[in-house]
Curated annotation (Swiss-Prot):
Name of this chain's protein: DNA repair protein RecO
Gene from which this protein is expressed: recO
Residue ranges that the Swiss-Prot or TrEMBL entry lists as coiled coil: none
Organism: Caldicellulosiruptor saccharolyticus (strain ATCC 43494 / DSM 8903 / Tp8T 6331)
rRNA-binding is among the record's keywords: no
Pfam families, sorted: RecO_C, RecO_N
Listed transmembrane segments: none
Entry keyword set: DNA damage, DNA recombination, DNA repair
Purpose: Involved in DNA repair and RecF pathway recombination.
GO biological process, one term: DNA recombination
Record lineage: Bacteria, Bacillati, Bacillota, Bacillota incertae sedis, Caldicellulosiruptorales
Protein family per UniProt: Belongs to the RecO family.
NCBIfam families: reco
Amino acid sequence: MKFIKAKGIVLKDVNFEESSKILTIFTSELGKIQALSKNCRRTLSPLGAVSQPLIYSEFVFTKTKEIYSISSASVIESFFDITQNVDLTIYSSYLIELVDSFIQIEQKNEDILRLLLNSLYMLKKGADPETVCRIFEIKMLIFTGFFPQFTQCVKCQKSNLSRIFFSFKNAGVVCAECKEENDMEISLEVVEKILIIAATDLKKLSKIRISKNLNNVLKTLMTTYIKLVLQKDVKILDFFKFIK
């Protein structure tokens, strides 16, 4: 029997049979996979600790035609403490849902895995969660190839715009002459902040600061655009109204 090693974070868990779980795990080596964690719900199971969302571990898998099975695993980093705070649970669930929605089974994207781990680490260390989410949204769009055009009008290619509008339909900014009825006017400050985040290395993202007013605009812009890209609602957004 062949053993396969991979490092990954559990995105979701679903109870299976009497004492097991089916885990959705995002790994660097195998991409997003589903794996059986057999008997992990038993009290003394050695797989219990690694079979929960927000746990980053090194796994050893075996594979049948149908599914991976976890042979053994050891925790590298636990973000489970985040779930002790209701607000942070909602924020982290949002990040997880975006990853799970953008990444297909067996699709690899190490940039997004690093982004997710970095973002969860920032939440764990007390970074402003709204800022973490805005950064995550922008970087996610870059790493998946859906980042909009912000440097010139997507229709006429004019740059240095006096007034800037965002076209959700055309995935980028448009000038006053090219704008349509439902396009959203945004300030130069919004565009500049997006481009700064886009150009900043993951290791330096903790230095980014976003004011409350700017965050509100970015949140509307990014969440609306992401829902259009995914062609579905992001369910966890409904829970943001409960955040204090």
